Amino acid sequence: MSGALPPSLDLARAARQTYGLQGRLPVKSLPRLTAVLASDAGEVELKLEAGLDPARRVVVTGRMDAELELQCQRCLEPVKLKVHAEPHLAWVKTDEQLAALPDGYEPLLSADGQVALKELVTDELLLALPLVPKHEGDAACGGFTKAAAATAEPDEARKNPFAELAKLKRGP
């Protein structure tokens, strides 16, 4: 079950016999994922199993864990976040199979029964990323909170932009 990871999952093989994969992928080997990260450092630990469910559907389940470095959207500094994905995928080849897919499964589209492992891992981790990556709590974004406090003070010397309109309304 462990060892070198194959380049693809063989879903046709999973229809005949359940098999599993376990291993690590370097983050830098996932270019679509690294495009949204602050750094390509780290590894993705994955454990996947492909086989038949009780309804005789070919399914892929498992887990993926990684510590990824993203850009904090509060202070714009790097932030390391643990990302976890638990895919529950079912192989579908036709629109009818897609329509009959029960809740709890996401479709895994493949005409030939081969799914590129790195693409699958990339897709699942991209979906697991937070919409707005940020540090936990305000203390970690020290530069942001100090800058925000400095700009939050009202500027007393600032003029009211509508004062000139009030003069025009009164007339000459």
Question: Each PLM stretch: what is its role?
Answer:
Residues 1-69:
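A positional/architectural concept
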Residues 1-18, 43, 80-172:
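Charge-rich, low-complexity linker and terminal segments
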Residues 34, 73, 152-153:
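Amphipathic, positively biased hydrophobic alpha-helical segments used for protein targeting
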Residues 71-74, 140:
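The −1 position to Zn-ligating cysteines in a subset of zinc-ribbon hairpins
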Residues 77:
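Short Cys/His-based metal-binding microdomains
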